[in-house]
């Protein structure tokens, strides 16, 4: 039976992934922005500012600031909910989908072994 990955291995994959994100061309995402991005892309929607704030246990203004940045980078967009005009829906974008695909590749390379992740392989945004 194969041994399960240790906490240190998970931390190593996280480090290699973050290093690759920092080294790539283009802007960085903060931890909060990345958390909002991943929540929108990995969990089924629809997503709202209110729902994201509750899911991540942060304030609605903090979610709004993160979405402002994700919108500037075309990684997510906001749209008024036609069913409830007081609510704003967060939508995925093609550029965000490509970023997630690249991020998965970087994480896979990092998980395969130390120093195997290509630092510049994520596209800049």
Model-derived segments and their meaning:
Residues 82-103:
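Basic, amphipathic "hinge/linker" alpha-helix immediately C-terminal to the N-terminal HTH DNA-binding motif
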Residues 46-88:
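Canonical helix-turn-helix DNA-binding module
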Residues 17, 21, 101-125:
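Amphipathic alpha-helical dimerization/coiled-coil segments
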Residues 1-28, 125:
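N-terminal leader segment of winged-helix/HTH proteins
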Residues 19-58:
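N-terminal helix-turn-helix DNA-binding core of bacterial DNA-binding proteins
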Residues 16, 35-38, 65-71:
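Generic structural signal for well-ordered, non-membrane alpha-helices
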